Amino acid sequence: MTTFLGNPVTFTGKQLQVGDTAHDFSLTATDLSKKTLADFAGKKKVLSIIPSIDTGVCSTQTRRFNQELSDLDNTVVITVSVDLPFAQGKWCAAEGIENAVMLSDYFDHSFGRDYAVLINEWHLLARAVLVLDENNTVTYAEYVDNINTEPDYDAAIAAVKSL
């Protein structure tokens, strides 16, 4: 059972599992452009999904994945939340993280529904990490049961490095 702030929460949809093909998406970048999964074609992808960049755990998760994986060839870390693109951009500027890919699902929550991470009770995204290979096949999936805790960074990073 997944919990948020100590309370059980529900989701719509089916969580992706290892071996599944990732769903396409259309999300808003910090410059208000639309980004799709196809924009990252041919790259290994880490989808770092968070409730809000304005929380300590989400900030730590975003910073850590960007620091530890930014030097890997042909790899992109994509952080997804329902924060407004302006808030995501402001966070990147304040943290001095210039090349982070921050995408927002604020507009219609379609990513949250398609990836089964939209918390029905709060309309925030749950914490999850998905690693996709160059063909968008899920090679690692972690949906964090207690959304207030950090993901297993070591396992996710090892999954990316093994590709």
UniProtKB/Swiss-Prot annotation:
What EC class does the entry list?
oxidoreductase
Q: What is its EC number?
A: 1.11.1.24
The residues annotated as the active site are C58
Thioredoxin domain: from which residue to which, for each copy?
Answer: 16-162
**Remaining remarks:** The active site is a conserved redox-active cysteine residue, the peroxidatic cysteine (C(P)), which makes the nucleophilic attack on the peroxide substrate. The peroxide oxidizes the C(P)-SH to cysteine sulfenic acid (C(P)-SOH), which then reacts with another cysteine residue, the resolving cysteine (C(R)), to form a disulfide bridge. The disulfide is subsequently reduced by an appropriate electron donor to complete the catalytic cycle. In this atypical 2-Cys peroxiredoxin, C(R) is present in the same subunit to form an intramolecular disulfide.
Subunit structure and binding partners: Homodimer.
What does this chain do?
Thiol-specific peroxidase that catalyzes the reduction of hydrogen peroxide and organic hydroperoxides to water and alcohols, respectively. Plays a role in cell protection against oxidative stress by detoxifying peroxides.
**PANTHER family recorded:** THIOL PEROXIDASE
- The protein's name is Thiol peroxidase
Q: Which gene encodes it?
A: tpx
